[in-house]
C-alpha cells in the first residue's frame, strides 16, 4: 500500500464528499437505501476513532420529484426552488439514518462568500469545530437557495476541498459514480485506472469530462479539488460511492492523490483558493521575476496599470505582460492610491507610501 493510501486509511479527521448521483435516483428523489449504506460506512469509520465531516450533494436532485420535475433545471430560480425542497428532505434523511446509531446531525449551509470573507471563514470554522467537539455529524452543502451565480462554489468537489482545509482534515474522500481516475473515457472500454497520482506530471494526457445528468461535478472538478486539497497538505481518495466501505476502511480502492510535501500556510491558502479577487494589478516583466522567481514583495515601480475598484486588505490578481495571472495577493493600498504611485520608485514617494503594495508574506505565485 502506498504512503498516500496509508495516510488516508489512518487519518484521524476526514472530510467525505458524496455526489448527487450516489444519493438520488435517475428520475429525482432520494434513494434512502443508498444513503443508509453510506451512513453505515461513515459510522464504521467514526467508531474506528476518526472524526468525519460529510459534504453532501443532492439537494436539487432530491427536490425534483416532489416538484413534478423530471430533469435537472437549467435556470437558477428553478434550481433554487428545487434546492429549498430537497435540502429539507436531504437533512431529514441524513438525520434519520444516523439516528439508527444514536447520532445527531447538524446542517451547515455555506455560500462562497462564507469562505471568501475572513470573518465568515473563521465563523464557519468555529461552527464545524464545535459540532465535532459535541460529537454531532456535520452535513455540509452549498446554500443553493440563496447563492447567486456570482457567489457559487461551482460544485461540491471544490467546497469539500475548502472544508477539508477549513477543519484541518487529514484526508479528503470523494465518493461519486466513478471508481477512480482513468487515462481515457472508461465508458469506451479501453481506459486504464490510474491508481496513484503523486505529481502534476502524472496527469499528462488525462482527459476529464463533464458532470452527469443529476450533478455538476465531472472529473475536471474532481481533479481541481484534488489539486486544491494538495495545496492544503490534504491527500485525496477518489472512489465509487458503491465502494464506500472499502474507501473508508482501508483506502484500498479508487485513485489516491498525494498532498504536496509542504502545505501552504492557512493565510496563503486562503489568498490563493478561497478569497474572491476584487481587482487586478498589471505588472511588468521585472516585477514578475521579483514576485514569482525571487519571492519578493511587489513595489509600485513594477506596476503598469490598475483594473477595478478595491481597498487595502482586499485580494487582487497580478497579471504579467502577456495578461496571464502570475500571482494573487493582499494589497496594502486602495486602488485609487495605487493609481497615483504606480511606476514610481520607493525613493520618490512620501514615507507613509513606501510600504510594498503587496508584501511577500501576502503573495502567492500561481
Curated annotation (Swiss-Prot):
It is found in: Cytoplasm. SUPFAM superfamilies: Carbamate kinase-like (SSF53633), PUA domain-like (SSF88697). Substrate binds at residues 57, 144, 156. Its main location: cytoplasm. ATP binds at residues 17, 176-177, 216-222. It comes from the Bacteria. Belongs to the glutamate 5-kinase family. This is Glutamate 5-kinase.
